[in-house]
Structure formats: structure tokens, C-alpha cells
UniProtKB/Swiss-Prot annotation:
CDD domains referenced in this protein's UniProt entry, alphabetically: Cas1_I-E
Single GO BP term: maintenance of CRISPR repeat elements
PANTHER family, per the entry: CRISPR-ASSOCIATED ENDONUCLEASE CAS1, CRISPR-ASSOCIATED ENDONUCLEASE CAS1 1
Keyword annotations of the record: Antiviral defense, DNA-binding, Endonuclease, Hydrolase, Magnesium, Manganese, Metal-binding, Nuclease
Transmembrane keyword on record: no
Gene3D superfamilies: CRISPR-associated endonuclease Cas1, C-terminal domain, CRISPR-associated endonuclease Cas1, N-terminal domain
Enzyme class: hydrolase
EC number: 3.1.-.-
Family membership noted in the UniProt record: Belongs to the CRISPR-associated endonuclease Cas1 family.
Gene: cas1-3
Pfam short name (any one): Cas_Cas1
Annotated protein name in UniProt: CRISPR-associated endonuclease Cas1 3
GO MF term list: DNA binding; DNA endonuclease activity; metal ion binding
Length: 299
């Protein structure tokens, strides 16, 4: 009997390319390939299994077969507005684990444990020890001051005129060039951070510093990397005054994510942050009922 080939497993998130933006076309599976078909019928093959996430802008349509294949290979589909500013919907790629969700929820619900996690986030962001008696309000105030100064410093270094972080998500074109570049750049970062959060088995919505949003935990994690990655990339792009700033800043972010090996760092950082709470993931009781159908056997 000829031995069968083993099932193909998804590529680990750390080995994937970061994010691709697509619009004005239809995603489908044709002859086994994941393709984008534009309005002229021209096909462009997308290596969906090697991507962390696909950001789908206005004008994009997705077939059932394309969604199914993206889910099987673990590529996150994110439906966004022009420039990636507004999030409309997310296709879950699988990977969530109840033990890790319960662990995350326990850390978030306990005020003492939650503060430990928040202080660890601030320590990683600003390179200082915040384990002493700081309240969340004090940390937020400190964050605001340092973030504003961070923007001003990078603007000075790149020669960009900076009037503050201002944009209207309902009027994309009304923002100035630096803010448009920043919005497009942070959208790219949010996409890969959400893919990493889901790949690690956690919930994007259970945040610690951010709360009340579908992507609260994504924002928490993205903030840990923002000022070393997408903010400098956005200002450098704005300094060039390109004709298509959103397109150029996405290319810059893609290259930067690859150079810094960001996808290899996000999940270990998530674990480091949550470990600061000082508890272990809860073990299930002996009497719980296991799944009737294992995940890898579901159709």
C-alpha cells in the first residue's frame, strides 16, 4: 500500500510575510490557487499561506472558497476602509485555545494582576522599571507626555512639519500628509499584531490598558512596537512627499517588518507581558467533557 502524504500544516506565524493590502478585485480559488481577479479579468496569484494577514479595502470581494482556504492556512482576512483606517470585519483564522483565553481573562479581571501586566507593558515600551507604586492614571499621563514628545522628536529628525496627531476616519482626505502616513502605517501594524494574537490563542478584544474595543489587546501589543517601527517609517515616507503616500508607507512597513523580523518577536512578547501577572494558565477540571470531534477532523 502506498503511504499517504502527511497533512500540510500552516506555516508558523514567525516565518510568514507580514501583510498585503488588496482592493478593487475579487478573491477566489481557481485551479487550486488563491488569486485576485481584477475588473479586466487579469489574475494575480496571492501566496495566502505565507501571509500573516490580508487587508481588504473597498472594492474587494471574496468568494466562499477563498475564505475557506484562508482559514485553513491561517491567514487573517481583515475588511478595512480606505487606507486601512476603519475596521469593518475580521475573518477568524482559527487557533484560539480556551485555556489561553481563560488565562487572559483571569489576568484582565483581577485588578492586581492586570496592573502588573500594564506595568510590564510600560517597562518594555519605555525601558524603565515601573514596578513601584504607579496607578493606571499616572501611567496614562506619563504615556501621553512621552508619546507626544516621541512624535515631535521623530518629526524633527526627519524634517517633517508636525502639528499633532489629528485625523477624521470619516474624511480620509482631510488629514495632512504625516497623519495619513501614520494611519496607513499603524493599520499595517494592527493587522500583523491581530494575526499574532489569534495565532497564539488569545482574544484580540480582552485588553489591559485599552478596553471596550474589538481590538483592545491588539492595540496594547502594537503600542509596544509602534515607535520603533511604523512611526519612523511613516515620517520618513512623509518627508519624501510621495504621490501615493499610503502605498509607499505600506511598502516601507513591509520591508521594515522583514528587516526587524517583527513577526518572530510578537508572540514571545505577548507571552512575556502576560507572564508578568505571575500566574499560570488554569488547568481544566478532571470532570470536563473533551471535544466530541477533534479539531483536525472537523469538516
Amino acid at each position: 500500500m502506498t503511504p499517504t502524504l502527511p497533512d500540510i500544516k500552516p506555516i508558523p506565524i514567525k516565518e510568514r510575510s507580514s501583510v498585503v493590502f488588496l482592493g478593487r478585485g475579487e478573491l477566489d480559488v481557481i485551479d487550486g490557487a488563491f488569486v485576485l481577479v481584477d475588473t479586466n479579468g487579469i489574475r494575480m496569484q496571492i501566496p495566502v499561506g505565507g501571509l500573516a494577514s490580508l487587508m481588504l479595502e473597498p472594492g474587494s470581494r471574496v468568494s466562499h472558497a477563498a475564505v475557506s482556504l484562508a482559514s485553513k492556512v491561517g491567514c487573517l482576512l481583515v475588511f478595512v476602509g480606505e487606507g486601512g483606517v476603519r475596521l469593518y470585519s475580521v475573518g477568524h483564522p482559527g487557533g484560539a485555545r480556551s485555556d489561553r483565553l481563560l488565562y487572559q481573562a483571569r489576568l484582565a479581571l483581577d485588578e492586581v494582576l492586570r496592573l502588573k501586566v500594564v506595568k510590564k507593558m510600560f517597562s518594555l515600551r519605555f525601558g524603565e522599571d515601573f514596578s513601584d507604586a504607579y496607578s493606571v492614571e499616572q501611567l496614562r499621563g506619563l504615556e501621553g507626555v512621552r508619546v507626544r514628545e516621541g512624535y515631535r522628536k521623530i518629526a524633527r529628525d526627519t524634517g517633517v512639519i508636525w502639528n499633532g496627531r489629528r485625523y477624521d476616519p470619516h474624511s480620509w482626505g482631510s488629514a495632512d500628509l504625516p497623519n495619513r502616513c501614520l494611519s496607513a502605517a499603524t493599520a499595517s501594524l494592527y493587522g500583523i499584531c491581530e494575526a499574532a494574537v489569534l495565532a497564539a490563542g488569545y482574544s484580540p478584544s480582552i485588553g489591559f490598558l485599552h478596553t471596550g474595543k474589538p481590538l483592545s489587546f491588539v492595540y496594547d501589543i502594537a503600542d509596544l512596537f509602534k515607535f520603533e517601527t511604523v512611526v519612523p517609517a511613516a515620517f520618513k515616507t512623509a518627508a519624501l512627499n510621495p504621490r501615493e503616500p499610503e502605498r509607499e508607507v505600506r511598502y516601507a512597513c513591509r520591508d521594515l517588518f522583514r528587516e526587524t523580523q517583527l513577526l518572530k518577536r510578537i508572540i514571545p512578547t505577548i507571552e512575556e507581558v502576560l507572564t508578568a501577572g505571575g500566574i499560570s494558565a488554569p488547568a481544566p477540571p478532571d470532570w470536563v467533557v473533551p471535544p466530541a470531534i477533534p479539531v483536525d477532523e472537523e469538516g
